[in-house]
């Protein structure tokens, strides 16, 4: 049964243009062609990247965060077995009846119980240091892979002449630079998938899962069908905007608000140029229109462009939130990240600390969230 499925899955009619056979893509005369087995190494490399990330966050990102004044927030409370048991088994916001009953059991005031539960909830939420570490790691990878991509592509004719993307397709040998560009990029996305359970949970969690899996699927498919030339162009224009996003988030967590806003505006410009001009009018034109001058439409051609259009749909999704943030910046005084992490704003944390020292709950209500024109309150995150 497995052999039957394997034969069906790798049928040439699904992957290659008519008249082309897998035997045409066998290595010969020192030329190496893509093989699906090349991608197996991306899984162990993904775990290796996770190890590198651990040491990077510990020995590079954390000292950098400390130098920028970002410290690990400590939320300390007195141990209380009754309240701890209630907290672990409660799935919703405690009602007034719950608070009243707990106060009686623990011989505490209702206000003390509410404050204990609120602080205990904060202990389970990521602090600014953890968010900075994540952004610093992503910024470093995107910066290095974009620089590598620029080096790999600058002397390639298909980077300047899109017709060269399809010249002699699919009999295009694999270059060492293309191999490492793909392997590192795919390994990174696998590492993001594997770390989803431990990374900071965000409101657009599902969109991130779809994005990561779509990226891996697109890269895997383009590799197996030998769409390497167009694939490297897609990866490069996607990585280049993420550098600015992650750097803006880093400065947001550090409290460098003017720098953060400047970087966010640069990110916005780069994002819309790369995702709404270059991608649809250059990349999609290259993959959707130009091949028809060489080949008749076939399955992998259709499937490739279907995946690229799904990717463009995600661009529209994230572009909507970016425009929404800019709209708040221009027309309102209170700017929040509409797709930020599921946690309170940093200003709210400061106000709660003031409440605990002064013992006045009304102080928190009066202060509110402030009117800071800060574009990325808790770090806009999206690809």
From Swiss-Prot:
Residues 342-354 have a biased composition (Acidic residues). GO terms for cellular component: endoplasmic reticulum; endoplasmic reticulum membrane. Residues 130-331 form the TLC domain. Residues 66-127 are annotated as: Homeobox-like. Keywords: Endoplasmic reticulum, Lipid biosynthesis, Lipid metabolism, Membrane, Phosphoprotein, Transferase, Transmembrane, Transmembrane helix. Residues 355-364 have a biased composition (Basic and acidic residues). It is a multi-pass membrane protein. It comes from the Eukaryota. This is Ceramide synthase 3.
């Amino acid at each position: 049964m497995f052999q039957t499925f394997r034969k069906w899955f790798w049928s040439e009619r699904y992957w290659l243009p008519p008249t082309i056979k897998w035997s045409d893509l066998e290595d010969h005369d020192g030329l190496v062609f893509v093989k699906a087995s090349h991608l197996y190494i991306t899984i162990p490399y993904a775990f290796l990247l996770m190890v590198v990330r651990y040491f990077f966050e510990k020995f590079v990102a954390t000292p950098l965060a400390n130098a920028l004044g970002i410290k690990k927030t400590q939320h300390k409370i007195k141990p209380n077995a009754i309240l701890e048991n209630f907290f672990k088994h409660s799935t919703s916001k405690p009602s007034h009846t719950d608070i009243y009953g707990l106060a009686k059991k623990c011989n505490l005031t209702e206000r003390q119980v509410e404050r204990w539960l609120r602080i205990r909830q904060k202990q389970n939420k990521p602090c600014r240091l953890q968010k900075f570490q994540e952004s610093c790691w992503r910024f470093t990878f995107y910066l290095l892979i974009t620089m590598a991509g620029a080096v790999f592509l600058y002397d390639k004719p298909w980077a300047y002449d899109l017709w060269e993307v399809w010249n002699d397709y699919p009999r295009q040998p694999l270059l060492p630079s293309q191999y490492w560009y793909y392997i590192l990029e795919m390994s990174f996305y696998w590492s993001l998938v594997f770390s989803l359970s431990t990374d900071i949970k965000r409101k657009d969690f599902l969109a991130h899962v779809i994005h990561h899996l779509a990226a891996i699927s697109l890269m895997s498919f383009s590799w197996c069908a030998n769409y390497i030339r167009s694939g490297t162009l897609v990866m490069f224009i996607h990585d280049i905007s993420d550098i600015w996003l992650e750097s803006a988030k880093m400065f947001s967590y550090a409290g460098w608000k003017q720098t953060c806003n400047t970087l966010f505006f640069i990110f916005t410009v780069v994002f819309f140029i790369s995702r709404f001009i270059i991608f649809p009018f250059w990349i999609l034109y290259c993959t959707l229109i130009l091949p028809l001058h060489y080949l008749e439409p076939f399955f992998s051609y259709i499937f490739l462009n279907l995946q690229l259009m799904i990717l463009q749909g995600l661009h529209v999704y994230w572009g909507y939130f970016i425009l929404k943030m800019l709209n708040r910046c221009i027309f309102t005084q209170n700017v929040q990240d509409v797709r930020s992490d599921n946690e309170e704003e940093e200003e709210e944390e400061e106000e709660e600390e003031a409440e605990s020292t002064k013992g006045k709950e009304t102080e928190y209500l009066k202060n509110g969230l402030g009117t800071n024109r800060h574009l990325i309150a808790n770090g806009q995150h999206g690809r």
